[in-house]
């Protein structure tokens, strides 16, 4: 594999992972709030 592909893809992969973690954490928090209110 060409090293330039790795140079281009790795920041995108890091950004996508970071976004998924942040969105996932917010979604879990919101889901827990909704479930907590129903109980």
UniProtKB/Swiss-Prot annotation:
One of its GO terms (molecular function) is manganese ion binding. It holds the Pfam family PsbY. It is a single-pass membrane protein. It comes from the Bacteria. The keyword Transmembrane applies. It is found in: Cellular thylakoid membrane. One of its GO terms (biological process) is photosynthesis. Its main location: membrane. Disruption phenotype: No visible growth phenotype, decreased rate of O(2) evolution during growth at 30 degrees Celsius, 50 umol photons/m(2)/s; as light increases above 1000 umol photons/m(2)/s O(2) evolution decreases dramatically. Decreased amounts of peripheral proteins PsbO, CyanoQ (PsbQ), PsbU and PsbV in purified PSII. The keyword Thylakoid applies. The chain crosses the membrane at residues 4-24. One of its GO terms (cellular component) is plasma membrane-derived thylakoid membrane. Keywords: Membrane, Photosynthesis, Photosystem II, Thylakoid, Transmembrane, Transmembrane helix. PSII is composed of 1 copy each of membrane proteins PsbA, PsbB, PsbC, PsbD, PsbE, PsbF, PsbH, PsbI, PsbJ, PsbK, PsbL, PsbM, PsbT, PsbX, PsbY, PsbZ, Psb30/Ycf12, peripheral proteins PsbO, CyanoQ (PsbQ), PsbU, PsbV and a large number of cofactors. It forms dimeric complexes. Belongs to the PsbY family. Loosely associated component of the core of photosystem II (PSII), it is not always seen in crystals. PSII is a light-driven water plastoquinone oxidoreductase, using light energy to abstract electrons from H(2)O, generating a proton gradient subsequently used for ATP formation. This is Photosystem II reaction center protein Y.
């Amino acid at each position: 594999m060409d090293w330039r592909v790795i140079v281009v893809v790795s920041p995108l992969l890091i950004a996508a992972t970071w976004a998924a973690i942040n969105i996932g954490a917010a979604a879990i928090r919101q889901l827990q709030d909704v479930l907590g209110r129903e109980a």
